[in-house]
Amino acid sequence: MAQNKIEKSEEDWKSVLTPEQYHVLRQKGTERPFSGNLYYNKEKGIYTCAACGQELFSSDTKFESGTGWPSFYDVISSDRVRLHEDNSYFMKRIEVVCSRCGSHLGHVFEDGPEPTGQRYCINSVSLGFTKEEDTGKEKE
């Protein structure tokens, strides 16, 4: 279940986000491809919204799309994101925003792998990452 909504003024967002995060998350910017630190991340864990911390994606659904941005074929739960039509830059796309704080995450396309056929193409700077803790148990 999605967490309670967070509402802040743009000045409040500016005070808690880096300039690059603010540009992407609040002004719907896009980071340069292959520049984000989480694009190359191969660790197991949970990807969260960088603005509010809501859990969004599992590393189990991350895949290499070759686009230069972290790509996932599914969200943790459909109530974690909202989808909006985006016709900017003379393109027809579907924007993905965090359902908790309304921050821009990226876009979703219908060219992903099975089982969903979707590719959530997400700006690395829009994400946080919580590494899966090693439980010390041996795999069976």
Curated annotation (Swiss-Prot):
Its GO biological process annotations read: protein repair; response to oxidative stress
The residues the record assigns to binding Zn(2+) are C49, C52, C98, C101
Catalytic activity of the protein: L-methionyl-[protein] + [thioredoxin]-disulfide + H2O = L-methionyl-(R)-S-oxide-[protein] + [thioredoxin]-dithiol
List the active-site residues. C121
Q: Which residues form the MsrB domain?
A: 10-132
Q: Which cofactor does it need?
A: Zn(2+)
Q: Does the keyword Lipid metabolism apply?
A: no
Gene Ontology MF terms in the entry: peptide-methionine (R)-S-oxide reductase activity; zinc ion binding
Query: Does the UniProt entry include the keyword Hydrolase?
Result: no
EC nos: 1.8.4.12
Could you give the cofactor binding note from the entry? Binds 1 zinc ion per subunit. The zinc ion is important for the structural integrity of the protein.
Q: Which GO terms describe its cellular component?
A: cytoplasm
Q: Which UniProt keywords apply?
A: Metal-binding, Oxidoreductase, Zinc
Cited HAMAP family: MsrB
Record family assignment: Belongs to the MsrB Met sulfoxide reductase family.
Q: What is this protein called?
A: Peptide methionine sulfoxide reductase MsrB
Upper taxonomic lineage: Archaea, Methanobacteriati, Methanobacteriota, Stenosarchaea group, Methanomicrobia
